[in-house]
């Protein structure tokens, strides 16, 4: 653990030198971790600002694990660009995010999965108990972010054995925000978070050919994007076909990016 302004500055530089494209910090206590209360803030404001300065020097940004409104506001005021989780946000914190142009990446499916399988997979009892303190609040947080104009990206935060649940996040989001906004969170908004608009999250000339063909219209039925790809007849990444059940497309064909 890096401790102190000089130490966090060095740690950020080292991670960037090793190829990190973004820097993530812990700005509050967590759920899966049994020893840090979720209401605590972590890192001093000077430490956070030092990390942000190093990220900006490398033309990138800082994302912060944060749950409470206090931790969220504090991190954003110090220059953090993206909040991960953010379940316990309040209206004041959402306004701060909007004013600073910050994003949030909710990770709601992980709480359902941890509530179901956490104990079986070895999650400590204290951590299992924390899940319910943020599970419903996470769903409620979507309404707060939407009401205050905070853009939401797509995330899952699932542990290794739970990755099969990640697309269920679409269903949870759609129940509250509607199908279109659930899809935008994983396409155009995600591209904006990564500062790669026009390259990712869009279908246009010159963009990376990351494409799927869906058997049906997910604007009508978001469940078409859930599961294990049962309704995806074509998956293309960077112009290369990884899955193809379309009768009208040659699976060996590839697109050559300019």
Give the positions of each predicted feature.
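Active-site mouth loops of central-metabolism enzymes
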Residues: 1-11, 61-63
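Generic hydrophobic/aromatic pocket-lining and core-packing "Φ" positions
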Residues: 12, 52, 72, 94, ...
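Active-site core of metal-dependent hydrolases
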Residues: 26-140, 153, 158-160, 192-194, ...
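C-terminal cap of metal-dependent C-N hydrolases
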Residues: 186-188, 192, 205-249
């Amino acid at each position: 653990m890096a401790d102190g302004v000089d130490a966090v500055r060095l740690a950020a530089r080292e991670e960037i030198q090793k190829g990190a494209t973004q820097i993530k910090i812990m700005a509050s206590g967590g759920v899966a971790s049994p020893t840090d209360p979720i209401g605590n803030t972590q890192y001093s404001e000077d430490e956070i600002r030092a990390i942000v300065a190093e990220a900006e020097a490398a033309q990138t940004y800082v994302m912060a694990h944060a749950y409470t409104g206090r931790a969220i506001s504090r991190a954003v005021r110090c220059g953090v660009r993206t909040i991960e989780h953010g379940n316990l946000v309040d209206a004041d914190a959402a306004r701060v995010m909007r004013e600073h142009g910050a994003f949030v990446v909710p990770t709601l499916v992980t709480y359902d999965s941890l509530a179901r399988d956490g104990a079986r997979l070895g999650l400590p009892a204290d951590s299992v108990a924390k899940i319910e303190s943020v599970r419903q609040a996470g769903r409620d947080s979507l309404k707060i972010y939407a009401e205050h104009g905070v853009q939401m990206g797509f995330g899952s935060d699932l542990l290794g054995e739970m990755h099969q649940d990640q697309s269920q996040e679409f269903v949870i989001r759609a129940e509250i925000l509607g199908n279109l906004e659930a899809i935008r969170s994983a396409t155009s908004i995600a591209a904006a978070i990564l500062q790669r608009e026009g390259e990712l999250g869009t279908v246009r000339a010159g963009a990376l050919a990351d494409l799927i063909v869906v058997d049906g219209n997910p604007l009508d039925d978001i469940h078409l994007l859930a599961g294990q790809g049962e309704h995806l007849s074509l998956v293309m990444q960077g112009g290369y076909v990884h899955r193809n059940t379309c009768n009208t497309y040659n699976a060996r064909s590839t697109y050559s990016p300019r």
